[in-house]
């Protein structure tokens, strides 16, 4: 039943079937969609420990490399000591909280507390990172066990399993070079050359370590490292590292492209020269029904002015709902849009009307200089503002002109198979749009200003008008106050006086009218004295009546 309803809905409303964005009307004002993708959000990460062993095992060539090793240790100390001091400043001021139950007087772990008075100044990010750092740190027994294991291994990648804990992966970026190149060549090379070769390799490795952890010297507690950045310190074989860490699945490529695998420094040992990292591997959760659309705008001309429609770069749709989309925490991959946090937030009703096809709700702004797209390829057709850019049919060599009553030109294969626009030659396909958009056919939206200077000027004008309106309101309030101050008696006297004047005026007008009527009758009798009726043979009573 639900499937049947959806099919009927799609047939009766085709725009609803393909989404709530009215691409047909938007294309008339130069807005086209350039792509759509699913929406995935990173959820809670799983953590695993990774150890970077900075000092290789040189037992086989120890006699030839003492000088180079001493210099290498000195260089490592310049990087490791500041990081160790910053980590200790946070971790030594974080204490576990223990609570006692009311029924049984035994203590149990309840959380951690930060000694803010001893720490002094710390940002919210540093405090949060410090708490997470404390929770992911190894205990002293695990550290000592790790040291013993690292001293005996001579492998580039070693899986170290500790009692009661998960596997720890230890990596040494120079060990393969020592095992596979220097040790076999000990019989052919002099001791001095072996030392020089190792010194150059260690110096290069130190440079990679410095470029990786150098930015962390400023704030090693909250600094995060991507797995791509770690690849050099891990010997360059990132695929082998990911395999050892157990990272696989269909989302691995998407997570790598979005740089979702992060590492944070949790421990630094300046005696044994190793760094412990906590690797966070997120899982992806696809939000069903949400589609992220990417938009582009093409400028159009109204007379001599060039405009473009102001719309967001990305929007999201889910059913009938259209929302804004913040692409800042997101990465766009072939598998979809991957965000580290929710990037959808509400859109104003007016802008939603714009996307649903009401072009009068779409704001527009002037194009400044040469900024803005003047052509774009959509559905194989070229949508161009040929009033602002030269459009030429490459096939015939003729110029494609745009009449003043047109705002955009749509070029397809039936008009010109190969088009040259803006110095670019494009082969277009069959027609998907009308040949042009006429100005009288479009209800354009209100003009707005986006430049800081224009916005400031418009704001100053608005403030000036508000000040003038305020002055007028103050004047009207003053007049109203004066009217309220007049007493009721004075008002009554004024009304009585006005009434008497009106009555006297009416009487004077009435008398004047009567006098004028009498004067008219007298003048009529004087002007016709000879007109007398013939009364011969008429009775006296009739004459008297006359």
From Swiss-Prot:
Transmembrane segments: 492-512
Region of interest (Fusion peptide), residue spans: 109-133
Cytoplasmic domain ranges by topology: 513-546
Pfam families in the record: Fusion_gly
Record key words, sorted: Cleavage on pair of basic residues, Coiled coil, Disulfide bond, Fusion of virus membrane with host cell membrane, Fusion of virus membrane with host membrane, Glycoprotein, Host cell membrane, Host membrane, Membrane, Signal, Transmembrane, Transmembrane helix, Viral envelope protein, Viral penetration into host cytoplasm, Virion, Virus entry into host cell
Coiled coil: 134-162, 458-483
Domain of life of the source: Viruses
Protein name: Fusion glycoprotein F0
Family according to the record: Belongs to the paramyxoviruses fusion glycoprotein family.
Membrane topology term: Single-pass type I membrane protein; Single-pass membrane protein
Disulfide bonds: 330-339, 354-362, 386-391, 393-416
Complex formation: Homotrimer of disulfide-linked F1-F2.
Primary site of residence: virion
GO cellular component: host cell plasma membrane; membrane; viral envelope; virion membrane
Localization in the cell: Virion membrane; Host cell membrane
SUPFAM superfamilies per record: Head and neck region of the ectodomain of NDV fusion glycoprotein, Virus ectodomain
Signal sequence region: 1-19
């Amino acid at each position: 039943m639900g499937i049947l309803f959806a099919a009927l809905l799609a047939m009766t409303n085709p725009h609803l079937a393909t989404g709530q964005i009215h691409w047909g009307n938007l294309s008339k004002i130069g807005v086209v969609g350039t792509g759509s993708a699913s929406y995935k959000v990173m959820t809670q990460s799983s953590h695993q420990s990774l150890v970077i062993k900075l000092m290789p095992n040189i037992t086989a060539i120890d006699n030839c490399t003492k000088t180079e090793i001493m210099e290498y240790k000195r260089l490592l100390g310049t990087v490791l000591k500041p990081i160790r001091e910053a980590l200790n400043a946070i971790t030594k001021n974080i204490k576990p909280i223990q609570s006692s139950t009311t029924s049984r007087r035994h203590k149990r772990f309840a959380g951690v507390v930060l000694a803010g008075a001893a720490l002094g100044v710390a940002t919210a990010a540093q405090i949060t990172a410090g708490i997470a750092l404390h929770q992911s740190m190894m205990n002293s027994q695990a550290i000592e066990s790790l040291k013993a294991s690292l001293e005996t291994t001579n492998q580039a990648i070693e899986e170290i399993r500790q009692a009661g804990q998960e596997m720890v992966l230890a990596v040494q970026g120079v060990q393969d070079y020592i095992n596979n190149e220097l040790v076999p060549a000990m019989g052919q090379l002099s001791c001095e050359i072996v030392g020089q070769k190792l010194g150059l390799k260690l110096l290069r490795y130190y440079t990679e370590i410095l470029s990786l952890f150098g930015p962390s010297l400023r704030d090693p507690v909250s600094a995060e490292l991507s797995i791509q950045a770690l690849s050099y310190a891990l010997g360059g074989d990132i695929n082998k590292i990911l395999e050892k860490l157990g990272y696989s699945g269909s989302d691995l490529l998407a997570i790598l492209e979005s740089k979702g695998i992060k590492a944070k420094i949790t421990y630094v040992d300046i005696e044994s020269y190793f760094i412990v990292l906590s690797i966070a591997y997120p899982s992806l959760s696809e939000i069903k029904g949400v589609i992220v659309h990417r938009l582009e705008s093409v400028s159009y001309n109204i007379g001599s002015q060039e405009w473009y429609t102001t719309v967001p770069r990305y929007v999201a749709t889910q059913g009938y709902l259209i929302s804004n989309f913040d692409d800042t925490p997101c990465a766009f991959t072939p598998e979809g849009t991957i965000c580290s946090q929710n990037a959808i937030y509400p859109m104003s009703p007016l802008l939603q009307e714009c996307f649903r096809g009401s072009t009068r709700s779409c704001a527009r702004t002037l194009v400044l200089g040469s900024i803005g797209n003047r052509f774009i390829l959509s559905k194989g057709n070229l949508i161009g503002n040929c009033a602002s850019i030269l459009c030429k049919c490459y096939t015939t060599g003729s110029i494609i002109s745009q009449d003043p009553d047109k705002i955009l030109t749509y070029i397809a294969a039936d008009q010109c198979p190969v088009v040259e626009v803006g110095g670019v030659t494009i082969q277009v396909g069959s027609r998907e749009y009308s040949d042009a958009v006429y100005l009288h056919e479009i209800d354009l939206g209100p003009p707005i200003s986006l430049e800081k200077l224009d916005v400031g000027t418009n704001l100053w004008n608005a403030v000036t008008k508000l000040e003038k309106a305020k002055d007028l309101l103050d004047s009207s309030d003053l007049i109203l106050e004066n009217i309220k101050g007049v007493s009721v008696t004075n008002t009554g006297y004024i009304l009585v006086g006005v009434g008497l004047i009106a009555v006297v005026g009416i009487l004077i007008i009435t008398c004047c009218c009567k006098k004028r009527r009498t004067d008219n009758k007298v003048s009529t009798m004087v002007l016709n004295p000879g007109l007398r009726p013939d009364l011969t043979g008429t009775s006296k009573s009739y004459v008297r009546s006359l």
